[in-house]
């Protein structure tokens, strides 16, 4: 069949079917169909998925004045487009526009349009590329665009993503159908009031937000499967989590207390990263051990150097009071002596471990941190762990440099890993051949270590 015949067949379809077809295209592709004919020009204005992304529509000039007029023309185009929309329900609406505070009237019109069409999936990104920390956005909060009154009356939402605007969580009247929420660069006071009205919530992702008012997530939200906090600040002292079906939990930021009233016994992944901390906090040991104990069932567990260092302040710095179910353990590390107790603690607490990954990260000095062990003798102790005897098959080192402490840890694992099949060493990115010479030599040394397993293969990538 030639292309002309295909076009003829498509032209025989009803407008209803053609709208369904273009609604499965990207918005940019849907707009391109308007060039086919007058009929298509009208049909493309009925697509059910609308996406206005400034990076796809405009190539901005270097001059700030020229950029302003380009953005003004873009907002006028978007408003004109929705004013000429001839369709019915809108399934999804996306708006990505930086420096939007000068165009609040136009942005408000676009939001009200989406609300009027009973949008199910709403994504508003009004953030600035230059923002790096919460404070960057918080200082500009009075100038951020405020969501219109009509927004708080919407009842059709299934997905809500809001970046860089003023939003009052407690005022959203009927979010009972919402399954996914993602907030970034927003003050989130009284978030608990919103979550208490979302019984179908499955995913909650919060990044770079401040004044988060979240005292608890209760069993009312027992469908919640994924919970992520990244570089946020909380107004509460702690948050209680009753999340019996949680699959993924990730936290990045300063030490914060989560009390788990319940957690899934079949978790997929847990991630704990306190690298924003710069001071050694002895009292954080209890928080860390409580978190680890609550996440015992996680099949994949990732922790940062700060956690490895603070483990020695746990009530029992040898092992958790119950075994972890972890199969893959990812340790972000500098291989410093003050992390050794934490590394051994995690090995000792993971009797079913199959893959151990070390990811080298840049050093971040922790004030008042003093190693409590002799680094020269620590890995020479004749102490093995259950996982080394029965389950550990693979060890990975990402950004392998071949430092003294790296080699000591690897020598220990190879000497006692009875089931070990692979040790994969990945070279650092961006080094030239001269810089790689000593690293290759160190990798060769690893291949010569005395191995307990007869099937071990050491590979340098």
Swiss-Prot record:
Instruction: Report the GO terms under cellular component.
Output: nucleus
Record has Transcription as a keyword: no
Which locations, inside or outside the cell, does it occupy?
Nucleus
User: Taking the first listed entry, what is the main subcellular location of this protein, grouped into a coarse class?
Assistant: nucleus
Q: Which domain of life is it from?
A: Eukaryota
Q: Pathway, per UniProt?
A: Protein modification; protein ubiquitination
Keywords linked to the UniProt accession: Nucleus, Ubl conjugation pathway
* Gene3D superfamilies, alphabetized: 1.20.1280.50
What's one GO BP annotation on this UniProt entry?
A: pollen sperm cell differentiation
Which parts of the sequence belong to the F-box domain? 7-55
Subunit structure, per the record?
A: Part of a SCF (ASK-cullin-F-box) protein ligase complex. Interacts with ASK4.
* Role according to the record: Component of SCF(ASK-cullin-F-box) E3 ubiquitin ligase complexes, which may mediate the ubiquitination and subsequent proteasomal degradation of target proteins.
Tell me the domain comment. The F-box is necessary for the interaction with ASK proteins.
Q: What is this protein called?
A: F-box protein At3g62230
* Organism name: Arabidopsis thaliana
């Amino acid at each position: 069949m030639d292309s002309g015949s295909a076009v003829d067949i498509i032209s025989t379809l009803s407008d209803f079917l053609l709208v369904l077809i273009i609604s499965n295209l990207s918005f940019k592709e849907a707009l391109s169909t308007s060039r086919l004919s007058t009929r298509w020009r009208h049909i493309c204005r009925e697509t059910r998925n609308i996406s206005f992304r400034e990076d796809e529509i405009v190539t901005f000039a270097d001059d700030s004045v020229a950029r302003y007029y380009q953005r003004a023309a873009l907002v006028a185009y978007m408003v004109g487009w929705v004013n000429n929309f001839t369709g019915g329900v809108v399934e999804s609406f996306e708006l990505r526009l930086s420096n939007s505070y000068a165009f609040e009237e136009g942005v408000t019109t676009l939001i009200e349009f989406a609300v009027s069409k009973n949008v199910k999936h709403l994504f508003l990104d009004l953030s600035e590329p230059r923002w790096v920390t919460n404070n960057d956005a918080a200082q500009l909060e009075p100038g951020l665009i405020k969501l219109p009154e009509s927004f708080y009356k919407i009842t059709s939402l299934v997905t809500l993503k809001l970046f860089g605007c003023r939003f009052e969580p407690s005022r959203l009247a009927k979010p009972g159908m919402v399954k996914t929420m993602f907030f970034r660069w927003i003050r989130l006071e009284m978030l608990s009031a919103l979550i208490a009205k979302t019984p179908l919530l499955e995913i909650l992702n919060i990044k770079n937000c401040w004044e988060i008012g979240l005292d608890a997530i209760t069993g009312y939200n027992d469908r919640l499967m994924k919970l992520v906090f990244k570089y946020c600040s909380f107004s509460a002292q702690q948050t209680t989590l009753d999340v019996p079906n949680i699959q993924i939990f990730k936290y990045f930021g300063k030490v914060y207390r989560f009390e788990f009233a319940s957690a899934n016994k079949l978790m997929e992944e847990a991630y704990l990263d306190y690298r924003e901390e710069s001071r050694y906090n002895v009292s954080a040991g209890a928080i860390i051990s409580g978190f680890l104990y609550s996440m015992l069932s996680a099949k994949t567990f990732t922790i940062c150097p700060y956690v490895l260092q603070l483990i020695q302040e746990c009530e029992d710095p040898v092992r958790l009071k119950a075994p972890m179910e972890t199969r893959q353990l990812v340790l972000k590390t500098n291989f410093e002596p003050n992390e050794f107790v934490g590394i051994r603690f995690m090995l000792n607490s993971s009797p079913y471990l199959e893959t151990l990954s070390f990811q080298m990260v840049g050093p971040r000095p922790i004030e008042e941190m003093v190693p409590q062990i002799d680094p020269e003798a620590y890995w020479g102790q004749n102490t093995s762990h259950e996982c080394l005897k029965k389950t550990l098959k693979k060890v990975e080192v990402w950004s392998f440099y071949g430092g003294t402490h790296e080699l000591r840890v690897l020598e220990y694992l190879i000497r006692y890993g009875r089931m070990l099949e692979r040790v994969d060493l990945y070279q650092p990115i961006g080094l030239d051949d001269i810089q790689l010479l000593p690293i290759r030599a160190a990798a060769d040394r690893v291949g010569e270590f005395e191995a307990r397993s007869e099937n071990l293969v050491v590979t340098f990538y």
